[in-house]
Amino acid sequence: MTDTRDVVIVGSGGANIASLTGALERLGADAALSTDADEIRGARAVILPGVGAAADAMTRLHSFGLDALLPALAQPVLGICLGMQLLAAGSEEDDAECLGVVPGRARRLPASPDLPVPHMGWNRVRKDGGSVLLRDVPDGAHFYFIHSYALPLADTTTGRTEYGSEFTAVFESGNFFATQFHPERSSAHGATVLRNFLEHAL
């Protein structure tokens, strides 16, 4: 890692990035929020966070021309929470069409009296094959989630979680990585995930 600004966080709207920026700075990375295509294109690593509705986030990305830019990026990209779902083909939420980096559509989690939706709080992540992001993370480690939609299991899944049914907690596909949980809110294991991404990217 260098002292120059290496990480650009995409301003996808609705996300409080203070905790994410702080977590990256503690790991020695200089990160900045941006919706500027040239700045994003020139970054050594890109993070796509997000909370809220997929359709609203896609509208915001489209307004900056980022819906075409992001899938074409060649540097490492990390999607977090809604950012993970935006990297998929689409979402059942408002029938949104997303960036299409990986196949599949985010589905609403099944609700029950014992398992309310949104899924909020700590849950286990089981490793599913080799994973860059989960290197040095124990199998079954707990991470912090807050979401109502999730991607089904797929060939790109490298970490899975169960909440009513199993869903993809981590995927890795080429230079694209994603977590449904919030690593910046997930204590030491979350810091390890972010460090693994930064070490891979920088």
Place the predicted regions along the sequence by residue.
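Amide-donor transfer/coupling interface in amidating biosynthetic enzymes
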Residues: 72, 105-202
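Short gly/ser/thr-rich secondary-structure transition/capping motifs
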Residues: 26-33, 59-62, 122-128, 160-162
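Short acidic low-complexity segments
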Residues: 31-42
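Cysteine-nucleophile active-site neighborhood
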Residues: 51-120
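Short acidic/histidine-rich motifs immediately flanking catalytic phosphotransfer sites
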Residues: 40-50
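Structural alpha-helical scaffold elements that stabilize or flank donor/cofactor-binding regions
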Residues: 39-40, 69, 170
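N-terminal beta1-alpha1 ligand-phosphate binding loop
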Residues: 7-29, 183-185
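Short, low-complexity, intrinsically disordered N-terminal peptides in bacterial proteins
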Residues: 1-8, 26-28, 199-202
